[in-house]
Amino acid sequence: MDFIIDAIVEWLKGLLVDGIMGNLDGLFDNVNQSVGEIATQVGTTPADWNAGVFSMIRQISETAILPIAGVILTFVMTYELIQMLIERNNLHEVDTWMFFKWVFKTFVAVMILTNTFNIVLAVFDVSQHVIQQSAGIIQNGTEITPDVLHSLRTELEAMELGPLFGLWLQSFLIQLTMIALNIVIFVIVYGRMIEIYLLTSLAPIPFATVPNRETGHMGQNYFRSLFAVGFQGLLILVCVAIYAVLIQSIATDGDPIRAIWGCVGYTVLLCFTLFKTGSLAKSIFGCH
């Protein structure tokens, strides 16, 4: 009778070990996929990320927003001329060079406005160049080698039925948690790119305010926002690099319980730091 019970226990232990190994293997596979997507997404320019969306945003900017920006620029330059005249003792000391200065400023402002999209893309090209140069530094991965999986299976097979069942429940629940965390990572990374497109679509309006001292703060803050969201990708890449180093230490650890909880803990930490990259980048560049 005892050998029947022992056989049933061994059969249940085999099922639980297979289930735990399947959950653990899939758990790290999801982590690898998410980390790989982050590194790929932040290293992509707005034009390459989605050609259809990029074309639509450019058409909206040039056909709907640019005419409004032209009207705003007209008012700004008219106000600038009035200010220049008033500053010279209420028209009592008017020099012809003032008008040449105003014409030159207007010419430069019009040139900037007509090349708004190229200037915006140049900002992101600079940030993407920095990101791509930094991407080669990340050499660590989170892949589990067959030797590590074999050692984990050996440890699991030596455990009793009760701890195995508890570990299987933990691995199952944590796998569901990791799916939710992967969704959060997706939202953060894709949300950044959507924010880039939204900033790009309205670019002509803040560009039109740059020539005047009183309204120029709007354009200056817009420039800071462009650099902030561009270099946010570098901060995201740094977070992924730190995460890859941390996760590698638990991926090669022989303790299955620690590997599971360590993985979910570091992934929660990654999500938290990814959320902070946006505000950190804006504080660094002084935009609000």
What are these language model-derived features?
Residues 75, 120-123, 127, 184-187, ...:
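Membrane-embedded alpha-helices of multi-pass transport/permease systems
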Residues 81-94, 182-186, 214-215:
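Membrane-water interface regions at transmembrane-helix termini and the short interhelical loops
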Residues 174, 178-210, 224-246:
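Alpha-helical transmembrane segments of helical membrane proteins, especially in multi-pass transport
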Residues 102-105:
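Elongated alpha-helical scaffolds
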